[in-house]
C-alpha cells in the first residue's frame, strides 16, 4: 500500500509539473468549472530585465535562515509535491509574504488532498468565478468584480509562470491569495525564481478585472487579485478571454524586477 501511495504521489507530481508548464493560471480558478483550463495568450519569452534592488531582496529569502539549505524545493510535505515544500524562506520579501502562512491550513496531508484534490483532472479544485469572493460571503452571492486601471510605477507579483493570467499587489500575504501549496514549488528549470515567485513594475497602464479573493485551500483569502482579460486591453489578442503575463512583458506593459 505504501509503495502504491508513493507511485500515486509521483504520478500526481508529474501531472502538476506538466499543467504548470502548460500555463495553468496560478492566482485563482478559471471560472464556474472547478477544473482549471490552460488558457494563455501566445507570446515569445524575452530575456529578463532585472532590477538590482528587487532581485537582491527576493533572493535574500531564497535560503532558510535556520539551515542555510535551498527552500521551496524537495523535501516536500509528506514526500508529496502536491503539498508544497517543507522549507520556506524566512527573510526578504518572500519571508514577509510567508510569515503568517500555515501550510495546509493545519489539516493532515491526506485530509487536505481529500478535500481539495480533483482526481478527474489530476489537479486542485479551484473556487468558481475565477476565484473572486462573493457578496456577503455567500456561495450564491454576486461575484465582487470591478474594473481597475493599473498605473505606471505600480508593483505587482505572482506565484506561477508567465503563462498565467493573474497578478496581485506586490507583497500580498500568501494565505490571502487563494492559491494551492504547490504554487510554492520552484520550477526545476527556473531556479532563478525561488518559490516560482515573480515581481513586475507597470510601465504602460492597462485595465484589469479587480476584486477580493475567495477563501480557498484552507486559507482565508481576502487579498486583492488582478485578472488579465483581453476585453479590457485593446492591443491584446482578442481570440482568447485571458491575457498571459508574458504577453504583457513582451508588449511593453510590464517589466520584470527579479
Show the residue positions of the predicted features.
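ADP-ribosyltransferase catalytic core
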Residues: 161-163, 171-219
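Secretory targeting and sorting signals
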Residues: 1-32
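Active-site or metal-binding loop neighborhoods of secreted/extracellular toxin and effector enzymes
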Residues: 207-258
Amino acid at each position: 500500500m505504501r509503495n502504491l501511495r508513493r507511485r500515486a504521489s509521483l504520478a500526481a507530481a508529474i501531472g502538476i509539473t506538466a499543467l504548470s508548464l502548460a500555463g495553468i493560471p496560478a492566482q485563482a480558478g478559471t471560472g464556474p468549472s472547478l477544473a482549471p483550463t490552460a488558457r494563455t495568450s501566445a507570446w515569445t519569452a524575452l530575456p529578463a530585465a532585472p532590477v538590482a534592488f528587487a532581485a537582491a531582496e527576493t533572493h535574500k529569502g531564497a535560503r532558510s535562515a535556520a539551515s542555510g539549505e535551498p527552500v521551496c524545493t524537495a523535501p516536500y510535505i509528506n514526500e508529496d509535491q502536491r503539498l508544497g515544500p517543507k522549507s520556506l524562506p524566512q527573510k526578504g520579501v518572500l519571508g514577509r509574504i510567508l510569515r503568517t502562512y500555515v501550510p495546509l491550513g493545519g489539516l493532515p496531508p491526506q485530509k487536505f488532498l481529500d478535500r481539495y484534490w480533483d482526481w478527474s483532472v489530476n489537479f486542485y479544485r479551484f473556487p468558481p468565478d475565477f476565484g473572486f469572493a462573493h457578496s456577503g460571503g455567500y456561495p450564491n452571492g454576486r461575484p465582487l468584480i470591478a474594473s481597475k486601471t493599473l498605473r505606471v510605477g505600480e508593483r505587482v507579483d505572482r506565484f506561477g509562470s508567465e503563462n498565467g493570467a493573474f497578478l496581485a499587489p506586490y507583497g500580498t500575504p500568501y494565505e490571502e491569495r487563494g492559491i494551492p501549496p504547490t504554487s510554492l514549488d520552484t520550477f526545476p528549470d527556473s531556479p532563478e525564481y525561488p518559490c516560482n515567485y515573480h515581481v513586475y513594475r507597470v510601465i504602460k497602464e492597462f485595465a484589469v478585472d479587480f476584486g477580493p479573493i475567495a477563501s480557498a485551500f484552507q486559507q482565508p483569502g481576502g487579498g486583492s487579485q488582478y485578472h488579465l482579460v483581453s476585453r479590457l486591453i485593446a492591443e491584446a489578442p482578442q481570440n482568447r478571454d485571458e491575457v498571459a503575463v508574458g504577453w504583457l512583458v513582451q508588449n511593453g506593459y510590464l517589466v520584470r524586477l527579479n
